[in-house]
């Protein structure tokens, strides 16, 4: 994990590294049976859709107990949690003066995987549970919030200077459902993480909150308590900044443009940087992940361009 974290910084000269992990790691290290199946994604031993199954889950704690891997071997959660801390500490040492950003999944995205039992396009079962059994949903989401916060806090304690809370599936929700059934639990994470002080900076680590397809709920996401709001490529950055007054923003180059001619990329980068000037702070990045077919040299050129234009402002 540490080497994969440091490589992009060495290769491209970006201004921060982000801890290389998986959104399912905190679930596994809380004793939940989950494996990554090739071509499918995370698959749980069983879905958590009933009050009984969720009640059984509530005794699980991050870094306690054990989980069973695909070979049937029992693995110690405490050892796994220690390996996360060690990976962060190693990455921090390797990065030197370059800060490390921690990583964690937001409660809804974790809960969606748990209720569905595997990846889903519409997260129908999770949405049904939230609407039909608020008590069970509250128990599950509170548990997910605690596990996510513990995972992120552990990374900050080990040296991460900031953290990012990813809500990959939040775009499947209506604004009302988000406000009533999801935002309170993301706020729990933000509140629990707020007290974590990075030993590297000696200060409380700022939190970035990002969700895909989040334009309809962007203003609500800004109220969760993060210091910076991530913006995906489908949302106009100038408009997004108006929705989150007083917040820094992160975003939001369309990953597809990485395949475009350089003059197209340069124009898009300049446009995003111009838009970002109206925010209290702007972290330039992609609006989603890097496509695997991307030429690494293109990424390096983008970083160089952002630095050049940023220094000139």
Show where each model-derived region lies:
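Active-site loop segments of alpha/beta catalytic cores
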Residues: 80-313
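Surface-exposed, active-site-proximal loop segments in enzymatic domains
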Residues: 32-36, 52-72, 115-131
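A gly/proline- and charged-residue-enriched helix-loop-helix capping module
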Residues: 39-94, 98
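Short alpha-helical segments and helix-capping/turn motifs at coil-helix boundaries
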Residues: 1-11, 84-93
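Catalytic domains of carbohydrate-active enzymes, especially glycoside hydrolases
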Residues: 3-20, 157-158, 223
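Short, conserved acidic/polar surface loops in the N-terminal third of protein domains
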Residues: 28-32, 47, 111-116
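Short, conserved beta-strand segments within well-ordered enzyme catalytic domains
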Residues: 16-20, 26, 99-101
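Glycine-rich loop at the start of a catalytic domain that most often binds anionic cofactors/ligands
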Residues: 24-39
């Amino acid at each position: 994990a540490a080497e994969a974290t440091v490589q992009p910084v060495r290769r491209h000269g970006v201004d921060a590294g982000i801890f290389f992990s998986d959104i399912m790691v905190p679930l596994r290290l809380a004793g939940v049976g989950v494996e990554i199946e090739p071509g499918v994604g995370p698959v749980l031993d069983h879905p958590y859709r009933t009050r009984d199954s969720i009640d059984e889950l509530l005794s699980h704690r991050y870094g306690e107990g054990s989980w069973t891997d695909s070979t049937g071997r029992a693995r110690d959660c405490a050892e796994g949690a220690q390996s996360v801390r060690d990976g962060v500490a190693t990455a921090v040492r390797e990065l030197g003066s370059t800060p490390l950003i921690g990583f964690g999944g937001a409660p809804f995205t974790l809960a969606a995987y748990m209720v569905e039992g595997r990846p889903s396009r519409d997260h129908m079962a999770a949405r049904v549970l939230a609407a039909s059994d608020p008590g069970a949903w509250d128990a599950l989401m509170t548990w997910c919030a605690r596990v996510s916060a513990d995972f992120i806090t552990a990374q900050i304690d080990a040296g991460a200077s900031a953290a990012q809370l990813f809500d990959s599936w939040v775009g499947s929700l209506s604004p009302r459902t988000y406000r009533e059934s999801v935002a309170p639990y993301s706020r729990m994470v933000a509140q629990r993480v707020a007290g974590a002080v990075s030993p590297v900076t000696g200060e409380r680590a700022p939190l970035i909150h990002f969700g895909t397809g989040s334009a309809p709920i962007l203003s609500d996401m800004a109220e969760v308590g993060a210091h910076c709001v991530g913006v995906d490529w489908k949302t106009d950055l100038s408009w997004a900044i108006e929705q989150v007054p007083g917040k820094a923003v992160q975003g939001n180059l369309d990953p597809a443009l990485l395949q475009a001619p350089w003059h197209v990329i340069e124009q898009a980068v300049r446009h995003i940087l111009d838009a970002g000037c109206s925010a209290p702070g702007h972290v330039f990045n992609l609006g989603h992940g890097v496509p695997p077919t991307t030429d690494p040299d293109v990424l390096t050129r983008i970083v160089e361009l952002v630095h050049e234009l940023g220094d000139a402002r």
